[in-house]
């Protein structure tokens, strides 16, 4: 073969290679498999629906990708039961081969799933299901769990301080009798008594209580206010039955009492009631207004904290995956990266402390009936009346001293002023 023939052959080969290269499909995005646990049936079903909608809305906004990875979202119904949550988590890990678990609702579910994550070395982002000791005394046992929203006592510490600032001296406490109720109420009691207030009574109705008739007559009359912590349908029934029984004094509550998952179903009797949380759909910022309008258009209701928390969880996963080029790095490297990210979230600035628990603004909110965000109808909204910025799970307490005390429970703090 002469030199000219060789040159022709080389040109043909090069042209063919270039054509083949240009015709090759783009590299497919990495797959990120997420196991999402939430109640879709049972008394907590609406909470689970809000959770799923918040997470899905972020996914839809980002064309089903987080940080460049194509998301496969596998949703399992835990029915609001910790034992069912464990069964579903095992299925997601062992059969579905997910990269991470997200969700759960009850604090008791958080306590149940954290050991599963440790045993299987599986990242677990407890977007809702969380509990104080998972980020406190038991933190070292559960290095694979992240709490991107809060722990139960975190919003109630500032509310205890706020109650003192209002001049309240004597308060009765009534809370659902399980971990979330104990820890939320305990945080309020400690902060309130540390600034001079007195909890004079503690009442513990079982979780899921519908009839508060046996409890209402026992509430003391010589008090300045009630602190209540209710969850699920309890949140709707308690204030209605309390007001019907003639109680007219202030009601203070945990955020789940008046959260937007239930607020639209309440009547005007809750106007003026106060609660504390890290989110309100009435947060008057351009970012939240846009979020509320988009969510309401998509799902026919205003977003709840269950919605926002899971939207923000998806945002945090997105930002973390971006820093790893869309490739899941494994649970501990993922957590290390996530811990270094400070989000400008819908609810405001949020970051993780050194024990993988969110640091948030905590908002004191009052139920008001008014128009917001251009809607032409008067509706119930949780108006923000005070902001406590950058609240950690340890509030204003020394962390080492705080960790030496027992976890908040039915018996701690002790009811030293009970009558």
Regions found by a protein language model. Give the residues of each.
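Extracytoplasmic "Venus flytrap"
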Residues: 35-56, 76-83, 105-106, 174-182, ...
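Periplasmic-binding protein-like
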Residues: 92-105, 125-127, 172-175, 201, ...
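Extracellular/periplasmic Venus flytrap/periplasmic-binding protein
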Residues: 87, 131-133, 142-246, 281-290
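Extracellular/periplasmic ligand-binding modules, especially the Venus flytrap/periplasmic-binding
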Residues: 187, 232, 237, 283-341
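Sec/Tat signal peptide C-region and signal peptidase I cleavage site
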Residues: 21-28
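Solvent-exposed, acidic/polar segments of extracytosolic/periplasmic ligand-binding ectodomains
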Residues: 32, 339-419
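Beta-alpha junction/loop-to-helix N-cap segments that form part of ligand/metal-binding clefts
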Residues: 31, 46-51, 61, 65-136, ...
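Bacterial N-terminal signal peptides that target proteins for export
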Residues: 1-13, 21
């Amino acid at each position: 073969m002469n030199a000219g023939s060789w040159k022709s052959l080389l040109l043909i080969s090069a042209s063919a290679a270039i054509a083949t290269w240009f015709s090759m499909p783009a590299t497919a995005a990495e797959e990120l498999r997420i196991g999402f646990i939430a109640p879709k049936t049972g008394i907590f079903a609406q909470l689970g629906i809000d959770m799923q909608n918040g997470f899905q809305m972020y996914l839809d906004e980002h064309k089903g990708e987080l940080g460049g990875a194509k998301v496969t979202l596998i949703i399992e119904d835990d029915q609001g039961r910790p034992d069912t949550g464990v069964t579903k988590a095992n299925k997601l890990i062992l059969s579905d081969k997910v990269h991470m678990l997200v969700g759960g609702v009850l604090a008791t579910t958080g306590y149940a799933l954290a050991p599963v994550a440790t045993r299987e070395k599986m990242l677990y982002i407890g977007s809702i299901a969380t509990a104080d000791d998972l980020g406190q005394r038991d933190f070292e046992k559960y290095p694979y769990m992240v709490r991107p929203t809060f722990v139960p006592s975190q919003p109630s510490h500032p509310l205890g301080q706020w109650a003192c600032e209002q001049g309240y001296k004597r308060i009765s406490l009534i809370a659902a009798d399980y971990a979330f109720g104990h820890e939320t109420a305990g945080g309020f009691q400690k902060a309130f008594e540390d600034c001079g207030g007195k909890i004079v009574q503690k009442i513990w109705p079982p979780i899921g209580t519908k009839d508060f008739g046996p409890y209402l007559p026992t509430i003391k009359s010589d008090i300045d206010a009630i602190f209540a912590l209710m969850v699920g349908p309890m949140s709707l029934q308690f204030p209605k039955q309390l007001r019907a029984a003639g109680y007219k004094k202030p009601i203070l509550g945990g955020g789940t009492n008046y959260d937007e998952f239930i607020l639209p179903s309440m009547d005007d009797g809750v106007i003026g009631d106060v609660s504390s949380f890290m989110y309100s759909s009435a947060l008057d910022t351009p970012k939240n207004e846009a979020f509320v309008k988009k969510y309401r258009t998509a799902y026919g209701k205003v977003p709840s904290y269950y919605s926002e928390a899971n939207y923000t969880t998806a945002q945090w996963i997105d930002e973390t995956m971006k820093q790893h080029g869309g490739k899941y790095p494994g649970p501990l490297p993922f957590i290390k990266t996530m811990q270094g990210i400070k989000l400008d979230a819908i609810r405001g600035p949020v970051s993780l402390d050194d024990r993988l628990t969110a640091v948030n603004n905590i908002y004191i909110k009052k139920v008001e009936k008014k128009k917001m965000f251009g809607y032409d109808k008067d509706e119930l909204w949780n108006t923000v009346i005070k902001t406590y910025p950058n609240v950690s799970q340890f509030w204003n307490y020394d962390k080492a001293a705080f960790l030496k005390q027992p976890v908040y429970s039915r018996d701690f703090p002790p009811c030293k002023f009970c009558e």
